[in-house]
């Protein structure tokens, strides 16, 4: 009766009778006996670890809600944005239910046709990209959700790149076929042209928009309808007469696409043999696992159509943990070379435990650490070691998560995703059960923040709550960074976008009772040089007794545009003019001096400091002497060189009705955007442009007003490039006024 207790806790009453065709046969109490930790370890073949990723508002959370309902995990379906006063199960944070967007990756597990499925529902908003990175790093397969109207959008391309980085096989689900203007064929064409995927339909729709009735399975050659109040009764029928020719054409196209990427099916195709259903399914599985083919499924999660066949496809075509190769890196102190060790996916204790902490969360249950187990067994009460810190910790409680609810388990094995309590660690740490292990899993790619704001508590008495909240948020999210500005005496928080930082300000008030005042957003401008500059600097200080002496000679070089965010140091000295023990001190001086540029006070970046020669004194030279010499050399080079200010450029995608095309183009041009492309379907157009982030503030309000609320846009960080002369002059004058080197113009409003 565990499930009834869970349902009661959710306030949703007992479960309805779910038909056997859904794959969850038997009585309600059967769930308890078929849980994850039933009797002994579940074999790898009966496990799938999947993520659901997509562009914002493509219907990821709605799809997950339907999956949980059809698999018997929840009793009642609820909608995103809490239209029914409840909100989706996977949106457990109050802010998520209010806004109707997913902010954190919610983890859950369920069961379909005797197969255990771990599901991570990820955010679609580009400001929360780190959550998607974390999810894909630890998953074996994924479902990429596309909107049938929007097709391949800005964040879809980002997610596709992330899947490629972590080599994640995936299926595609084109959602929202019931929406006006839905065009799955266009979405498929965009997958081929924009994402370079070898993709083909595995299903085609029976009707579109308001006439969407069901789907045709091209492999089994049959029509599928979804009857009942909630689409829970799956009914199979013959293909409608009017669609038989189209189904035959699409089936032939599917076979050709798969044959191009699978050798075995390719041979059958060349021999002009007709592949059987099982031949085709096996070929699709092989091609999907090798990422050479993407099967495309169709449906409407909101209208309860197409979800059960997608679940069948997850079992049929996505890999189990034993079919994915995961490597750990052996860090050897005496060698710069890193040895890769293949993890063993056997679900027993015959190999040492290795796990990766991929997400931290502090909620009402205390500190939670999400861990993916890559090898061996982890038991409740056992001792594990953090390979980064060398500290040992005891596993006091081991749980599986279902959104913000949890279920205690005694042990987990390779391939499982679980959560631990009371573990002190950082995101990306590796755990083993051997204290001398130097293993570490490959770290998760963390993008650099692009926007900063000043944040302080409204009430000075809330400083303790404020610091506690900031500490928790920085541990949870590596893209949320905090520093104290000694000049303005303000706490500056940095993140991936306005929404990202706004969410944290609201969480501070809701979760810690600490309302915050935020300043105007500040763009992460940087300063760099445009040409190499030589330097020859001597630092001397003599004030009685031992003095200071350090001389450095070399050149300061600009880095190529793709490395504008980096700082590099190169030691090209020969002999002992600059003793090797003082070279790190020169580097430290260079890096310290890069914290503030001479033009506008922003950080310096895109520089390479090449140390070629120098001199030292037997008595007076020490570490501090060469730190000062490194600082002085940089300042000397900057004084003699030509500097410029660089700014972040965003890739912007605007979608609006055709009647507002001229207005939208004019708005982007006014913000100094460079239009890179254009697309259109029916009454809507899509505009692609590169626009400076500094010019994008307030654009959402402008777009809403000039398109009567019908336009929408997304943007993501693209690159750094030199800003316009007018922007550079404005930033320099603002800095000179702030430092008192230039009188403030009369009548100018102070910020």
Swiss-Prot record:
Subcellular localization, as worded in the UniProt entry: Mitochondrion
Annotated tr-type G domain residues: 45-322
FT transit peptide: 1-37
Catalytically driven reaction(s): GTP + H2O = GDP + phosphate + H(+)
Gene3D superfamilies listed in its UniProt record: 3.30.230.10, 3.30.70.240, Elongation Factor G (Translational Gtpase), domain 3 (3.30.70.870), P-loop containing nucleotide triphosphate hydrolases (3.40.50.300), Translation factors (2.40.30.10)
Ligand binding (GTP): 54-61, 121-125, 175-178
Residue numbers carrying Phosphoserine: 92
The keyword NAD belongs to this UniProt entry's keyword annotation: no
Functional note: Mitochondrial GTPase that catalyzes the GTP-dependent ribosomal translocation step during translation elongation. During this step, the ribosome changes from the pre-translocational (PRE) to the post-translocational (POST) state as the newly formed A-site-bound peptidyl-tRNA and P-site-bound deacylated tRNA move to the P and E sites, respectively. Catalyzes the coordinated movement of the two tRNA molecules, the mRNA and conformational changes in the ribosome. Does not mediate the disassembly of ribosomes from messenger RNA at the termination of mitochondrial protein biosynthesis.
Family of the protein in this entry: Belongs to the TRAFAC class translation factor GTPase superfamily. Classic translation factor GTPase family. EF-G/EF-2 subfamily.
Record's protein name: Elongation factor G, mitochondrial
Organism: Mus musculus
Biological classification of the source: Eukaryota, Metazoa, Chordata, Craniata, Vertebrata
Gene: Gfm1
């Amino acid at each position: 009766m565990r499930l009834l207790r869970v349902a009661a806790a959710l306030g949703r009453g007992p479960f309805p009778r779910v038909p056997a065709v859904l794959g969850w046969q038997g009585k309600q109490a059967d769930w308890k006996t078929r849980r994850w930790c039933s009797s002994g370890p579940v074999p790898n073949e009966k496990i799938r670890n999947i993520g659901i990723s997509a562009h914002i508002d493509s219907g990821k959370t709605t799809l997950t809600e339907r999956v949980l309902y059809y698999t018997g995990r929840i009793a009642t379906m609820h909608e995103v944005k809490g239209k029914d006063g409840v909100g989706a199960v996977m949106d457990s944070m109050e802010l998520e239910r209010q806004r109707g967007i997913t902010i954190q990756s919610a983890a859950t597990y369920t069961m379909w046709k005797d197969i255990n499925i771990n599901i991570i529902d990820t955010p679609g908003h580009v400001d929360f990209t780190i959550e998607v990175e974390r999810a894909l790093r630890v998953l074996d397969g994924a479902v990429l959700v596309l909107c049938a109207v929007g097709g391949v959008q800005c964040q879809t391309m980002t997610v596709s790149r992330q899947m490629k980085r972590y080599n994640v096989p995936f299926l595609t689900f084109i959602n929202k076929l019931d929406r006006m203007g839905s065009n799955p064929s266009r979405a498929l064409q965009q997958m081929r042209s924009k994402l370079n995927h070898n993709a083909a339909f595995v299903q085609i729709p029976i009707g579109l928009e308001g006439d969407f009735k069901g789907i045709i399975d091209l492999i089994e050659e049959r029509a599928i309808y979804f009857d009942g109040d909630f689409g829970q009764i799956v009914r199979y029928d013959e293909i409608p007469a009017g669609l038989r020719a189209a189904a035959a054409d699409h089936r032939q196209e599917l076979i050709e696409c798969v044959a191009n990427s699978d050798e075995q099916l390719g041979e059958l195709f060349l021999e002009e043999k007709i592949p059987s259903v099982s031949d085709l399914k096996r070929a699709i599985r092989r091609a999907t696992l090798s990422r050479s083919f993407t099967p495309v499924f169709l449906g409407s999660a909101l209208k309860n159509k197409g979800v059960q066949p997608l679940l069948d496809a997850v079992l049929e075509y996505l890999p189990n943990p034993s079919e994915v190769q995961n490597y750990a890196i052996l860090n050897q102190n005496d060698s710069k070379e890193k040895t890769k060790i293949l993890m063993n996916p056997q679900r027993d204790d015959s190999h040492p435990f290795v796990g990766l902490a991929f997400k931290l969360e502090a909620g009402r249950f205390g500190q939670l650490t999400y861990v993916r187990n890559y090898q061996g067994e982890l038991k409740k009460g056992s001792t594990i070691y953090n390979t980064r810190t060398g500290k040992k910790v005891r596993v006091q409680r081991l749980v599986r998560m279902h959104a913000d609810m949890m279920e205690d388990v005694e042990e987990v094995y390779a391939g499982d995703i679980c959560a631990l309590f009371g573990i002190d660690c950082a995101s990306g740490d590796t755990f083993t059960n051997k204290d001398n292990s130097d293993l570490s899993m490959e770290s998760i790619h963390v993008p650099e923040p692009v926007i900063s704001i000043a944040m302080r508590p409204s009430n000075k008495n809330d400083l303790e709550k404020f610091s506690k909240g900031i500490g928790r948020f920085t541990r949870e999210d590596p893209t949320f960074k905090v520093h104290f500005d000694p000049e303005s005496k303000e706490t500056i928080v940095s993140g991936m976008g306005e929404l990202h930082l706004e969410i944290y300000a609201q969480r501070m008030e809701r979760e810690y009772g600490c309302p915050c005042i935020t300043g105007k957003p500040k763009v992460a401008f940087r300063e760099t040089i445009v040409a190499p500059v030589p330097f020859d600097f001597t630092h001397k200080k003599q004030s009685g007794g031992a003095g200071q002496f350090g001389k450095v000679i070399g050149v300061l070089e600009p880095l190529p545009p793709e490395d504008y965010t980096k700082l590099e140091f190169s030691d090209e000295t020969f002999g002992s003019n600059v003793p090797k023990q003082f070279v790190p001190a020169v580097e430290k001086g260079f890096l310290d001096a890069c914290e503030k540029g001479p033009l506008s006070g922003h950080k310096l970046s895109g520089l390479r400091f090449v140390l070629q020669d120098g001199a030292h004194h037997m008595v007076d030279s020490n570490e501090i002497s060469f730190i000062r010499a490194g600082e002085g050399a940089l300042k000397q080079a900057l004084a003699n060189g030509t500097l410029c200010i660089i700014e972040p450029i965003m890739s912007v995608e605007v979608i609006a009705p055709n009647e507002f095309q001229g207005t939208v183009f004019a708005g982007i041009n006014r913000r100094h955007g460079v239009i890179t492309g254009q697309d259109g379907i029916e009454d809507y157009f899509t505009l692609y442009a590169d626009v400076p982030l500094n010019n994008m503030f307030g654009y959402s309000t402008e777009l809403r007003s000039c398109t009567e609320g019908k336009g929408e846009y997304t943007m993501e960080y693209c690159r750094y490039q030199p800003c316009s002369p007018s922007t550079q002059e404005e930033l320099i004058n603002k800095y000179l006024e702030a430092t008192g080197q230039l009188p403030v113009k009369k009548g100018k409003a102070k910020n």
